[in-house]
Amino acid sequence: MLEVKKLGVILEPTTLPFETAGAFNPAVFQEGKTIRLFYRALNEEHKSCIGYARLEGPLNVVERWKKPLINREFSYEQHGVEDPEITKLGNLFYFFYVAYDGKNAVTAYAISKDLKTFKKMGVITPQITYQEAVELFKSARLKDAYFNFASLYKEEIGKDLILWDKDVSLFSKKINGKFALIHRILPDIQIVFFNDFRELTTEFWCEYLKNLSKYIILENKYWFESRNIGAGCPPIETKDGWLLIFHTVEEINENRIYRASAVLLDKKNPLRVIGRLKEPLFSPTENWEIAEPVLSEGKTLPPDWTPELTVVFPTGTALFGETLYIYYGAADKRTAVASVNLNELLEELKKT
């Protein structure tokens, strides 16, 4: 049986104003024994920026900045620079993040040569409304869940809401000469191929969405994926294929449970699935993975309280020997680490 070890929390919120409410969902980059974490820092106003920490070895935090590394600057990100992912391809680091303006959640990116200075390049996901997207979905002959999510968000937030396209990560090598980018339009995981980021215009996306069914890597299909799935860690190139650690969401009435899972994709054609876990890789089981409501002074949780949100949200990995360390957001508040033997995980995936 595949063994996953939970190694505990490595980052908690602090008293610094920019991260009093959360330090979680880190992008991870490994250089030998050095691990760089670019984490989502959340303040009391529920606005996010990017914090920075450095580890020596998989668990030992040796440096943590007391100010944001990347802050909110533009109107499209005025309420949040959230949930970063990072990939090095060639001589450039590509840094992706969810840009939130208080209503719309889109994906933007920045580039860096040294991981010290970042140049923001703007929004890359479709800037079309759900209303417009639904018409394009019809051409793609998508399942009902795509239309259900569109209706839900239009009713809850407004008809002018821009299509939410999140959970973006980049393959560390080009596939057949093209960039390969994983993204998530609810409820599945999709992939897009392109030659240059400048191609990602509204016209490009409209044509892509008309054919979206051709670019779905994974559909939500198992019991622990009942609501949706989404990418987590950037794809890892292995001898057997591309390993993708992703998140799953089970919805039980008003409660949501976020878990981690894994899939192995073909090296030359990542649309081809070699193997996929039929049970979670790991689930929220610890107290620090359960999101509790904020209570006023003197108040306690009622004895019949059940959590509305329990979360493990994998966002980055590091490899030491045969041990794969998985860094994840716990309870939308803190950063924790789990580990698994990489070869054993690959063998398990090849069995499925």
Question: Where does each model-flagged region fall?
Answer:
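Beta-rich carbohydrate-recognition and catalytic domains
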Residues: 1-21, 25-79, 88-227, 236-308, ...
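Short, conserved clusters of charged catalytic residues that mark active-site
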Residues: 230
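Extended, compositionally biased non-globular segments
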Residues: 312-317
